[in-house]
A protein has these predicted regions:
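Hydrophobic residues positioned within well-ordered beta-strands of beta-sheet architectures
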Residues: 18-20, 75, 91, 105, ...
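Hydrophobic beta-sheet segments that form the core/acyl-binding groove
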Residues: 75-113
């Protein structure tokens, strides 16, 4: 499967883990030949979107059924090593149990040898597409498989207040 020449393939694990393989290209790096944060976040978003689609929470379903959309509220990333041009990487993502307003999702980036080179965690919420107000997470029904208890980062964001 190819998307803009970047996605090399997807791997759906039994359970909540979802993977995408990417090849880092010239447009993905900065003048130091290291991955741009904007590209990393784009790949995180694409991989999370595909994983959400698999769980019944894709963009089309949310918009048509519930008149809501995903919005990224917070993200934290720790980079041990930045991938270089022509390097193949695998992005893994998995959700955690939802809160009242928020959905937490973790990420790992592995190099071709399987070493974890980047870790991330994020907080997402639902926003009403008409009123632009936050909506409770219980509004939608996601088909969650068993959760992975492992966290990519030992970091807790401050909870949202309704």
């Amino acid at each position: 499967m190819t998307k803009k020449g970047r996605i090399m393939g997807s791997d759906v694990e039994p359970g909540a883990l979802y993977r995408n393989e990417y090849l880092i290209e010239y447009s993905d790096v900065d003048f130091t030949k290291e991955l741009k944060l904007s590209t990393l976040f784009m790949h995180f978003q694409d991989t999370a979107g595909q994983a959400a689609e698999r769980l019944g929470g894709g963009v089309d379903i949310l918009t048509q059924r519930y008149s809501v959309a995903w919005v990224l509220l917070k993200i934290r990333v720790e980079i041990d090593r930045s991938p270089l041009i022509n390097e193949a990487v695998t992005i893994e993502t998995w959700p955690h149990p939802q809160g009242r307003l928020e959905f937490n999702r973790d990420y790992r980036v592995r190099d071709a040898k399987g070493n974890i080179i980047i870790r991330g965690t994020s907080v997402w919420a639902l926003i009403d597409t008409k009123t632009r107000e936050l909506r409770r997470s219980s509004l939608i029904d996601l088909n969650y498989p068993p959760f992975i208890e492992e966290h990519a980062l030992d970091y807790k964001f401050v909870k949202l207040k309704p």
